[in-house]
A protein has these predicted regions:
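Short coil/turn connectors at secondary-structure junctions
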Residues: 5-8, 37, 65-69, 117, ...
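Active-site rim loops that border cofactor/substrate pockets in soluble metabolic enzymes
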Residues: 43-46, 218-265, 274, 298-300
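N-terminal glycine-rich phosphate/adenylate-binding segment common to multiple enzyme folds
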Residues: 47-159, 163, 270-274
């Protein structure tokens, strides 16, 4: 039997622990007998990331930009216990976070619905697709442990040297602080990806943040989505017979539990991380979930939903 030829290499990102074994089985039994497999290999196992000071993660993302498509296995994001177990140089950041930031894409996750596996939520009749923003927020945050009393501020230094300061907290004792960021360009790409995907699949689009509490950070997401929708997609949605709906994240969770499904739920990075697991498990299993990172520049990274 002639094998299928590959003219362009596939970026292969190996992972940690059992994923390395499972990926090898998949290649040996399902791919290599039928495909003349052509891949550019990157070992994203924690030990190799530590050896390369995490440069291998950056290299794999750049290779994805070069070749267009990557397949990634699940990887370990180290905590304090893993630091000791693997004797790490430092607590390396999430490879997914690094790759998603470099590709600046949107993660679309949808349950694989099959007969015989009924959703735990009885009124769910159709798949619920989670569109997760793949840049910034807690995944690219800087953190600091505060040892004792003192003042913590956000400081923005403009190119001309002028400073803008915002008080975070006057600490009277030990604590912790975290600084998050996002980019308008990335939020705009996220919004356009979601609106375009909704049109191509003819599904309603929901979006939710907590703008009533986060009046600048989350409100920026809300405003950008609405501006792009009104300027570029409103008429297209009306012609397609679909709707765009914004609400608060807590209200969205309540509405999702009562809905029948059949829509796309756009979420910020952390919300999408959590809610995609909830939706996947309620539909049957996290392993019965597709996951693809779609970049506005046409790059695709397929990974196991985990």
């Amino acid at each position: 039997m002639d094998k299928i030829k590959m003219t362009t290499p596939l970026v292969e990102m190996d992972g940690d622990e059992m994923t390395r074994i499972l990926w090898k089985i998949i290649k040996d039994e399902l791919l290599l007998p039928f495909i003349d497999l052509n891949t550019e290999y990157y070992d994203l196992g924690l030990e190799h990331r530590n050896e390369t000071d995490d440069q291998v993660t950056v290299d794999s993302a750049n290779a994805t930009k070069k070749y267009g498509v990557a397949v990634k296995c699940a990887t370990i994001t180290p905590n304090a216990a893993r630091m000791t177990e693997y004797n790490l140089k430092e607590m390396w950041k999430s490879p997914n976070g690094t790759i998603r930031a470099m590709l600046d894409g949107t993660v679309f996750r949808a349950p694989i619905v099959v007969k015989g596996i009924e959703p735990c939520v009885k009124n769910w009749k159709k798949p619920i697709t989670i569109a997760r923003h793949a840049y910034g927020d807690v995944y690219k945050a800087s953190e600091m442990k505060i040892p004792g009393p003192g003042k913590c501020e956000l400081v923005y230094t403009a190119e001309d040297g002028t400073e803008t300061r915002e008080l975070i907290h006057n600490f009277t004792g030990a604590g912790v602080v975290q600084g998050q960021h996002n980019l308008n360009d990335s939020i705009e790409s996220f919004a356009r990806s979601c609106f375009s995907y909704a049109l191509s699949t003819r599904q309603d689009l929901w979006f939710a943040t907590k703008d009533t509490i986060s009046k600048k950070y989350d409100h920026t997401f809300k405003d950008i989505f609405q501006e792009i929708f009104d300027a570029e997609y409103k008429e297209k949605f009306e012609e397609a017979g679909i709707t765009y709906f914004y609400t608060l994240i807590d209200d969205a969770v309540a509405r999702v539990m009562k809905a029948e499904g059949g829509f796309i739920w756009a979420c910020k990075n952390y919300d999408g991380d959590v809610m995609s697991d909830m939706v996947a498990t309620a539909f049957g299993s996290l392993s019965m979930m597709t996951s693809v990172l779609v970049s506005p520049n046409g790059y695709y990274e397929y990974e196991a939903a985990h």
